[in-house]
Every structure is written in structure tokens, then in C-alpha cells.
Amino acid sequence: LTAKDQKTTFQSLVSDTLGEDCDYDTVRNIHDNLNELMAEAKESPDPLELSRPDVKHLLERSGVPEEKMEHFDKNFEEAVGEKNTLLASNIASVKTFQIETPDIIVKVNPERSDLVETREIDGRRCLVIAIDDHLEVNGIEVR
């Protein structure tokens, strides 16, 4: 699989595995845990390869419920192959953490994804972004 295909395949695996439970917190946990794995392997001369058990452990560690994992092995083998692996550098976004809606794109420092959460406010799903000190809109500092 090409790098782009690996990324698309991983995204589909996550989406298909989680189904209706594919929420912001779980996807953020997967992102954070994947980046943590890459940071731990940074000193190694070999690229970090993720086998089926590695990806399964990543998802479980990220809070994917056990009942959602029952078809994971079959889905991984169909999408990636029984003996094939995914390169972590192809499936992770270490430089950006991007949240999109049809009208809005929010880019967050990947190490600070904890500043963003989803909440229901007045019956609507909303992104809530913690602002610690400095806020700019189109280059203009606002209070």
C-alpha cells in the first residue's frame, strides 16, 4: 500500500471498528497514543511498523470498547493483509491535529489536543476550545 493508501486504510479501519461510537474523545486518544508510540520509537533507526496486534492494542488502549473490536482482525486482514504492517509515519499526523466541519477547519498543536473538547450546549454539539491567555483573530489580538 502507498503512504496515502495506508492513511486512508487506517482511517477506514478506525471508522468501521468504532461505528456509531466514533466520537471526538476516542479519535483524539488514538491520535495522542499513536504520537506517543512514535516519540518512543524516535531513536530507533528503523521506521515504526504497526502489525495487526499493534494496531489492535493501540485502539484498545485508546478506549475502544471490547465489543467493537470483534470484527477488527478480519477487517484488518482484508484491508492490509495478514502479514502486512502499517508505517506509523504514514498514518499519524504529528505536525497537525485538524478538526473539520463543512464550514470550519480548526488546526491545533498536536501536543495540545487536550485544549479542545466537544460538548452539547443548548441542544447542539459544539467544539469548546480552552483559551489560556492569548487570542488573535486575523492577526488582531482580542480580549
Locations of the language-model features?
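C-terminal, beta-strand-rich globular interaction domains
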Residues: 60, 64-143
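Long, hydrophobic alpha/beta structural blocks
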Residues: 1-93
